[in-house]
Amino acid sequence: MAKKKGEEQDFEEEPNFDDPEGFVDDVSDEELLGDFLRQKPCESDGVENVIVVDNIPVVGAARFPKLKGIIEKIFKNAGTIVNVHYPKDEEDNTKGYAFVEYKNQESAEEAVKSLNNYRLDKHYTLLVNRFADFQKYSDIPKEWSPPQPQPYKVQNDLYNFLLEADAQDQFCVVSETVPGSVQVQFCQNTQPEPTELLKRERFTDTYVKWSPKGTYIVTFHKQGVVVWGGSSFVKVNKFAHSNAQFVDISPCEQYLVTYGPNGQKIVIWDIRTGAEKRTFVSDGMSNASMLRWSHDDRYVARLVDSQIQIYDTTTFFLLDMKSIRVEGIRNFSWSPTDNIIAYWVAEEVDVPAKVTLMAIPKKTELRTKNLFNVADCKIHWQKSGDYLCVKVDRFSKSKKEKKDKKDSDVKFLGMFYNFEIFHMREKDIPVDSVEVKETILAFAWEPVGSKFSIIHGEPSSANVSFYETNKGQEPVLVKKLEKKVCGHLFWSPRGQFIVLANLQMGTFEFVDTNDFSIMKTGDHYRASEVEWDPTGRYVVTGTSGKAKEDQGYYMWSFQGRILKRVNLKNFMLFLWRPRPPTLLSDAKQKEILKNLKKYYSQFESKDRLRMTRASKELIEKRAKLREQFTEYRSKRVKEWEDQKKRRMQLRNNVDTDTLEADPDNVEEEIVEILVREDTTVIE
């Protein structure tokens, strides 16, 4: 209510905001105004965005525009360039260095990281440094003070898995426990039951991958990939590459390649140091953009615009500073044991297709094979590098079918197939040819040996042919298995044994190629993968993916006997841990095989002891489970008996615990079921 004019008004006393006597403010400006103070200008602003590029060519005014275009084209890949300054002398010549200013500090740091030691040509290698580093290095104190000694860090033994006394292999099982949570279980393949070594929840976001020799395992995450190793799988290194889709590891495990999504970069890393060695731009994840390694990690190559680009991994520069240009090249592949590249060139008008073997680093052509009427080629190296097979899809005639006014498709008619076999260990590399008229469904080399197998014909009734290749002789057909319903071939890594698989029906045939006897047949409904262990003793078939029922894996012996069935909900992947090549010489291996019989008694004795111990443990385990069940059942029976009075009250004092207790409420009904119907024809 308003007061009249002249009346005294009452106001509340204002609070006192003064600090009490002796008050000490312990809140710093950084805590109070942190966001604001971070925007405060400083002396290094602008300088952090500048880099210095040394060792650029010294040119005059006439050649300066070309030099400027080349330098700016190289450095714009690191970020947005604001300004480039080229100091010049009195005669208008450049002084051999330049200053490049980027939009932000991150771009400048990326330029230093990725373009330092960039090979401009065979005479000039660019040296890139941050401009701010000059001040840092000029402030180095004159008196040297020794660094503080760091405590010794015990390194994890990355090869511990090879010290297992009985040479039992390891494997990992990947499954999704809950949506978005992937579990990885590591096991030792002991008999009769595997031994769990480690189980990791949320170990990866998608899947895992072993390195070629089994030293490392790679996990995938949103921020990048992580490499693990050692007996307890500790972190060895992590590599920041957002949304990396998959990885590749070099044969000798020195380098890791991460592939980003379509249109993003491909990065080569040093596994041990974590250093970024080289980056490439992806062309949409086509097969041609994949990097391919030589057997010794010395070279890495890729196919770009009718050129094979081979990089020497000692510097990660192009070999001889230039690409190998091959017009019409379609694909290439390294030998698994030698620095030899095999590539094929498509057929042109009046120019035949050809397959060429080239030795690296000399780039000399070792062998060329001309081919006619070629639609496509597939290159298959034998694991030992002794043979190369080029599967050639050939046609009798072709015709063009127009898609629109500009484009047209080529349709091939009268298809037949040739297998060109190159004998790599013989003088002048002779080539033999095997012709097959029927459709080829699969091809596979025996990893250790001289045989190869082919599935040909109609999928519903195919034939499986086995050929033997010997030195100085043409391939010989040694066996033909007719009317087989299969589409995949899986050789044992030790040779001799092979699995003929039909993954659509889930049927498998185990064949011994010494006498081509079918040892066993089996089935695993909806099996989608087949994995041999490194020793060739066991085979695993797995069901995952779209199959919602019966997910899990079966383990078989090499003879086709099922050893165990494991049903696992949301099973994703089963992977054997690879092993490195043996250190024993061929002579030593032959000596061991020769004297193997005298070791049989030792092995059999050890196996019996292990099985006896395992049986005893299994009996004890079952007895313990039986005891637990009996105890649990006794408790439940006692509880049920104690509740009888309450049940009687609920049922009008009628005992319904047994059928005989209340016969008036029991109805007897006879049901007839037709079990079998036999029909006898009387003449």
Swiss-Prot record:
Ranges for the WD repeats: 199-238, 240-279, 283-321, 324-359, 435-477, 522-567
Primary subcellular site in the record, as a coarse category: cytoplasm
GO molecular function: RNA binding; translation initiation factor activity; translation initiation factor binding
Domain RRM: 49-133
Keyword Acyltransferase tagged: no
An example Gene Ontology biological process: regulation of translational initiation
Cell compartments where the protein resides: Cytoplasm
UniProt function note: RNA-binding component of the eukaryotic translation initiation factor 3 (eIF-3) complex, which is involved in protein synthesis of a specialized repertoire of mRNAs and, together with other initiation factors, stimulates binding of mRNA and methionyl-tRNAi to the 40S ribosome. The eIF-3 complex specifically targets and initiates translation of a subset of mRNAs involved in cell proliferation.
Entry-linked PANTHER family: EUKARYOTIC TRANSLATION INITIATION FACTOR 3 EIF3 -RELATED (PTHR14068), EUKARYOTIC TRANSLATION INITIATION FACTOR 3 SUBUNIT B (PTHR14068:SF0)
Name this protein carries in UniProt: Eukaryotic translation initiation factor 3 subunit B
Organism (species): Anopheles gambiae (African malaria mosquito)
Gene: eIF3-S9
